């Protein structure tokens, strides 16, 4: 009975918050400056990580770029330097906790306190449960979520001490809506979304108001990791479009970014619609991509 009374008492606040959100739709939010900020981006040698580095370089941030691919990392760094940015590169295996911690120690000693951390590195294996090797499942979790814990543990304390910073989680629409034949990937991205939400709540509980969090959840992105993706929602997104949304979200301190925006609507539908209807809807959306299927149906 008490909870019902509490909910009724909160009703005026709900109305005020809804009106406030509606008004904000028509008022462009001021973008913060990131000039001079030390920005560390994992997975910076390709795709979203590379393009995000370019955007921060244009905004005069100091860049710390991590990737396991030395050649890709050097290409990204060269372009960023051409844009006038100060750039530091580290070849780091984000599936290796000790490599992350030792590299983080070097960054703090040689460059300074990271104030914007972009956890972007990721791997994906397009296969069903039986065709996905145990080592691939382990690596998916090591890179796609455990690395977020290790990097954040390494760099968040300085942000909290200064009450200034930003932790960015690059997740996926597959962290909200499951997809067949991406079992390990979906599981890791659901974890990444949960990491972002729990970290956000933890910072609020500790009254650390100056450290912001942002989570990016795009649909299929045309980066070459998933072969021949298609859905009835439209073609795979170009990475430039996704990074534009990401940068706008970081600079305006948005908590959750969906790309395209319709993904947000689908996440709501999944929570309120009957399961039978959802099954039909998912068939209509018709997500397809090249995948290895290990399960063999028995002959009838």
Swiss-Prot record:
Residues 1-18 form the signal peptide. One of its GO terms (cellular component) is endoplasmic reticulum. It catalyses: 17beta-estradiol + NAD(+) = estrone + NADH + H(+); 17beta-estradiol + NADP(+) = estrone + NADPH + H(+). GO terms for biological process: steroid biosynthetic process. Its EC number is 1.1.1.62. Its main location: endoplasmic reticulum. The active site is at residue 185. It is found in: Endoplasmic reticulum; Lipid droplet. NADP(+) binds at residues 40-67, 189. One of its GO terms (molecular function) is estradiol 17-beta-dehydrogenase [NAD(P)+] activity. Keywords: Endoplasmic reticulum, Lipid biosynthesis, Lipid droplet, Lipid metabolism, NADP, Oxidoreductase, Signal, Steroid biosynthesis. Substrate binds at residue 172. The keyword Endoplasmic reticulum applies. Can convert androstan-3-alpha,17-beta-diol (3-alpha-diol) to androsterone in vitro, suggesting that it may participate in androgen metabolism during steroidogenesis. May act by metabolizing compounds that stimulate steroid synthesis and/or by generating metabolites that inhibit it. Has no activity toward DHEA (dehydroepiandrosterone), or A-dione (4-androste-3,17-dione), and only a slight activity toward testosterone to A-dione. Belongs to the short-chain dehydrogenases/reductases (SDR) family. 17-beta-HSD 3 subfamily. This is Estradiol 17-beta-dehydrogenase 11. The gene is HSD17B11.
């Amino acid at each position: 009975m008490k909870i019902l009374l509490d909910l009724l008492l909160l009703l005026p606040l709900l109305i005020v918050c809804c009106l406030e959100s509606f008004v904000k739709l028509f008022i462009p939010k001021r973008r913060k400056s990131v000039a001079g900020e030390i920005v560390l981006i994992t997975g910076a040698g390709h795709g979203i990580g590379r393009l995000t580095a370019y955007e921060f370089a244009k905004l005069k941030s100091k860049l710390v770029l991590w990737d396991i691919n030395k050649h890709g990392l050097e290409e990204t760094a060269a372009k960023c330097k051409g844009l006038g940015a100060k750039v530091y590169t580290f070849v780091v295996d984000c599936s290796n906790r000790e490599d992350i911690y030792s590299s983080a120690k070097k960054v703090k000693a040689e460059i300074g306190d990271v104030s914007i951390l972009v956890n972007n590195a990721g791997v994906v294996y397009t296969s069903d449960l039986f065709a996905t090797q145990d080592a691939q499942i382990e690596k998916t979790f090591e890179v796609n979520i455990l690395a977020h814990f290790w990097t954040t543990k390494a760099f968040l304390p300085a942000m909290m001490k200064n009450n200034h910073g930003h932790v960015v989680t690059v997740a996926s629409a597959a962290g909200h809506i499951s997809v067949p034949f991406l079992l390990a990937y979906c599981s890791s991205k659901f974890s990444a979304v949960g990491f972002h939400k729990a970290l956000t709540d933890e910072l609020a509980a500790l009254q650390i108001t100056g450290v912001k969090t942002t989570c990016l959840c795009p649909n299929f992105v045309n980066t070459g990791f998933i072969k021949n993706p298609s859905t009835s929602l439209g073609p795979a997104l170009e990475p430039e479009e996704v990074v534009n949304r990401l940068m706008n979200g970081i600079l305006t301190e948005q908590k959750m970014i969906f790309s395209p925006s319709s993904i947000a609507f689908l996440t709501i539908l999944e929570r309120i619609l009957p399961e039978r209807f959802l099954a039909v809807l998912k068939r209509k959306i018709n997500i397809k991509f090249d995948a290895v299927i290990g399960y063999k149906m028995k002959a009838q």
